[in-house]
Each structure stands twice: as structure tokens, then as C-alpha cells.
């Protein structure tokens, strides 16, 4: 259940950012926005909030399905803590999607996003338990945000509150992805300046 929640949230934030922004760039929408009074920070934060909002229905639907069809039982506090932590955990993935959207061409953004989605899902332990993977893949997976998001959920549902490694991994990816997104946006605005 936790892996599917992470996988669904990851796709939601990627599909709301990368390919969509690349398409908006291709049709000239981002250039149109720059001639309006809308500040760039507001435009970027709007994209980010939209991506995070898109993740919520996917997460909640998987949780409801887990309860309805598999009789998963957690306390209300565990459900809220798990969903909130995992929702916050997809922030670096949404930022990474922003970077892809502002860097990749329209025809490349979707395949690139899909490849990244599958790689993060497989290597991050969302397709199969990380413990059955070769050690090299486990080591790679532990450094990925997809594994860290799932680790938050697994720890919370297992009654373990301590998740410092997952939080550190997500913090590092958030910093790196935010930097990449800002640099990509600046590059885009410089290249498409009138």
C-alpha cells in the first residue's frame, strides 16, 4: 500500500509539471505570462502547489482502496501522519518535474519524465521490496527520493517514528531539485526574452 501511494503521488507530481510546462513553453504560454503582472515567483509557486495538490487524490484513493478491499487498519493518527509525511516527501519530485519542464523540449519531456518515473520506482523499491534487490541496487535506492518517501510511510505505519535518513535524503533532493528548477527557469526566461 505504501509503495503504491508513493508511486501514485510521484506520477501525479511529474505529470502536473514536466510535460505540461514543456508544452506550455512550446505554445508560447510562458512567454505570454511574462507580459502580465504575474511575478515569476508566483507562477513557479503556483505550478508547485498545483503539482502537490494533484498528488493528494492519488494518495487518498490508494488509502481508501487499501481499507475497503484489503482491510488495512491503522489509527487515524497513523493515517494522517503517513499521508502528510509522504505528501511533503514528494516536494523534491515536484521540483524535479519543474526543472524538466523548463529544460526539456516538448517532444522529449514526456518520455524523459516516464523514464525517470520508472527508474525511480524500480530503483526506489516501489515495484518490489528493496531487500530482494542486489546490494548495489539497494545502495542506489537508498539515495533516491522515491525510496525515502516510501520509507517515511513504512516507518510510520510500522509504528517507528525515527526516519532521519529518509528526511536527510529528501532534504538533499529538495535543495538540489529546487536549485535545478530555479536555474532551468532562469535559463528559459533568458533564452525566450523579447
Model-derived regions: residue spans:
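Hydrophobic/aromatic residues in alpha-helical transmembrane segments
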Residues: 13-17, 61, 95-96, 119, ...
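Transmembrane helix boundary and interhelical loop/hinge segments in multi-pass membrane proteins
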Residues: 13-38
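Short hydrophobic, aromatic-rich alpha-helical segments embedded in or entering the lipid bilayer
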Residues: 128-167
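Transmembrane helix segments
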Residues: 104-143
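Short cytosolic juxtamembrane segments of multi-pass membrane proteins
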Residues: 186-194
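Alpha-helical transmembrane segments and their short interhelical loops
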Residues: 40-113, 163-171, 176-181
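Long, hydrophobic alpha-helical segments
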Residues: 1-19
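Transmembrane helix-loop junction
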Residues: 23, 66-67, 71, 98-102, ...
Amino acid at each position: 500500500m505504501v509503495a503504491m501511494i508513493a508511486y501514485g503521488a510521484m506520477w501525479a507530481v511529474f505529470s502536473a509539471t514536466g510535460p505540461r510546462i514543456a508544452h506550455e513553453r512550446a505554445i508560447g504560454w510562458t512567454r505570454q505570462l511574462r507580459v502580465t503582472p504575474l511575478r515569476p515567483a508566483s507562477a513557479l509557486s503556483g505550478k508547485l502547489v498545483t503539482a502537490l495538490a494533484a498528488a493528494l487524490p492519488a494518495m487518498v484513493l490508494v488509502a481508501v482502496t487499501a481499507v475497503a478491499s484489503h482491510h488495512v487498519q491503522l489509527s487515524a493518527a497513523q493515517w494522517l501522519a503517513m499521508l502528510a509525511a509522504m505528501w511533503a516527501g514528494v516536494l523534491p519530485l515536484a521540483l524535479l518535474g519543474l526543472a524538466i519542464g523548463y529544460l526539456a523540449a516538448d517532444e522529449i519531456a514526456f518520455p524523459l519524465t516516464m523514464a525517470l518515473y520508472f527508474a525511480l520506482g524500480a530503483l526506489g523499491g516501489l515495484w518490489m521490496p528493496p531487500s530482494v534487490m542486489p546490494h548495489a541496487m539497494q545502495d542506489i535506492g537508498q539515495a533516491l527520493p522515491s525510496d525515502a518517501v516510501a520509507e517515511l510511510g513504512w516507518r510510520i505505519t510500522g509504528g517507528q517514528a525515527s526516519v532521519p535518513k529518509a528526511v536527510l535524503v529528501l532534504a538533499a533532493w529538495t535543495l538540489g531539485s529546487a536549485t535545478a528548477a530555479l536555474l532551468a527557469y532562469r535559463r528559459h526566461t533568458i533564452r525566450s526574452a523579447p
